[in-house]
Amino acid sequence: MLEDEILSEFRASQALLEGHFLLSSGRHSAHYLQCARVLMDPMRASRLAAATAAKIPRDLRHQIQKVVSPAMGGVIIGHEMGRALGVEAMFVERPTGTFELRRGFALNPGEKVLMVEDVVTTGLSSREAIKAIEQAGGEVIAAAALVDRSAGAVDLGVPFFPLVALNFPTYAPDELPPELAATEAVKPGSRAKP
């Protein structure tokens, strides 16, 4: 899929939002990708996962034994990536603030894992998920995501294969441009308080 086709999928599902958003990283942005909306259509989710899987070099793809994604945002795309790769998919979650495998999920020692996210901005959640996977005995050999908001700047400590890399600027709270500072931020992500 070309970048225009990918963004067309986001626009068609009303997943590309504009306004003032407080990201889960604590940074602010005028753009937000609500991947839950783009993934709510199973056929679209399947297409995007297949295109993301195709970004991973064939020799590396064949080594992947499990897909693990962080809840909540990564659950659907992680499942679809498991389908695209023909391997089981599971997720880590934060019942007490730290990612861990639950619900009977387990990894065999040394099992080769692809960590899958929906969106990566600073990489904090991804690195936390990778740490949890390694603590559970898995070996993370690569990471993938629908969207790399860092436009290639993020370092996850493993090879990283995003479907698309976007450069939507993000800002620290004390560096907001006037147009964002003039409006209240909306916190739409998975770490938002109800």
From Swiss-Prot:
Record bears the keyword Glycosyltransferase: yes
Gene Ontology BP, a term: pyrimidine nucleobase biosynthetic process
InterPro entries listed in its UniProt record: OPRT, Orotate_PRibTrfase_bac, PRibTrfase_dom, PRTase-like
GO MF entries: magnesium ion binding; orotate phosphoribosyltransferase activity
A UniProt-annotated Pfam family: Pribosyltran
Keyword Glycosyltransferase belongs to the record: yes
Pathway named in the protein's UniProt entry: Pyrimidine metabolism; UMP biosynthesis via de novo pathway; UMP from orotate: step 1/2
Catalytic activity: orotidine 5'-phosphate + diphosphate = orotate + 5-phospho-alpha-D-ribose 1-diphosphate
Residues that hold orotate according to the record: T121, R149
Binding site for 5-phospho-alpha-D-ribose 1-diphosphate: E117, D118, V119, V120, T121, T122, G123, L124, S125
Enzyme Commission number, as recorded: 2.4.2.10
Coiled-coil ranges (or none): none
Cofactors named for this entry: Mg(2+)
UniProt keyword list: Glycosyltransferase, Magnesium, Pyrimidine biosynthesis, Transferase
Subunit description: Homodimer.
Similarity field: Belongs to the purine/pyrimidine phosphoribosyltransferase family. PyrE subfamily.
HAMAP family assigned: PyrE
Function (record text): Catalyzes the transfer of a ribosyl phosphate group from 5-phosphoribose 1-diphosphate to orotate, leading to the formation of orotidine monophosphate (OMP).
Name by which UniProt lists this protein: Orotate phosphoribosyltransferase
